[in-house]
Amino acid sequence: MGAGGFRKNTGRNNTTLPYNVGFLNNVQDTETYNVAVYDELQKVSTATNQMFQAIDEIHEEIDVRIKALNAMNLQFDELENRITTEIETAIADIQTQMGNLSTEDIWDNSVQPPVKLESTVSGFKTSIEGNTTKIQTVEGIVNDQGQEIALVQTELQNINGSLSQYMKLSEYEATWGVNSTVNGRYAGVKLTNNGTNSQFQVTANKFIVGDGSSGNTPFVFEGGRARMEFADIKNVNITTAQIANARIQWAQIDNVSISNAQIQNLSADKITAGSMWGSNWRLTVGGDFVMGGTGGAQLWMNGNRIDFYDGSGALRIRIGSW
């Protein structure tokens, strides 16, 4: 707060937070990578120092305003004491003057009070009204100062409570992160690199990767599930999958277990299978093929012969060797 009552301009008005981290591209060796990481962390350090400097300036501004408010409170107390003294003195003077007046001076056969007493009372009234105006003026200034201080304190609490940006750089590990807590909800990002392993962590209820040109969101992670509109994967290893509708142009599968299959066209060099059944046919593991006919008749075929049985189970025709 300046001398004219204007709000102090601090560095926090020019600070942009949080710091946007760039990606490290085209890094060929460990030395180049470490230099690139160090440069990024220096940028983070600069942004962090700007934020902490802005917070320090807010603390200084609060201290200045509190001192100004204390000084005004002291002036208010001094003014109150002076006004009280003036009122008590004026009352004592009136009492003394009235004690010295005679009956003729007070009434003088007139409805008007005597000039001397009237002048004293009028002066006393003017003094009281002037002091009241001073008190109201001081109270207004004090209230304005209190509102300004409350505003700055709220601003500082929002900065300290909702955003904490930190950076740690040592011989063994470099860490950068931004954490935000609002209404009990926590979100943040964290980047850690110790020269051997690196980690990038995102904590949020919903994580979105969007297309800057089209505005589409091809990747969304929410509620423990990841959703991708389109994926071009060169190699993938899936332990368990649930696919509602899939189209595969070409697949090489070493082992597969299918409960139910609908195949329009099938071409295979070799198929190894156990027994298979249909509504009126059966193919056994031993190589027998049985086909049912009308009235319970059956046709049996294997590598040696062909047998035909009628509805009663009697052999009617046998072709081959036996």
Swiss-Prot record:
Described purpose of this protein according to its UniProt entry: Putative tail tip fiber protein.
Source organism phylogeny: Viruses, Duplodnaviria, Heunggongvirae, Uroviricota, Caudoviricetes
This protein's record includes keyword Nucleotide-binding: no
Signal peptide feature range: none
Entry's localization field: Virion
Disulphides: none
Organism from which the protein derives: Escherichia phage Phieco32 (Escherichia coli phage phi32)
Protein name in the entry: Putative tail tip fiber protein
GO cellular component terms listed in the entry, alphabetical order: virus tail, fiber
InterPro entries referenced in this protein's UniProt entry, alphabetically: GpJ_CSF (IPR015406)
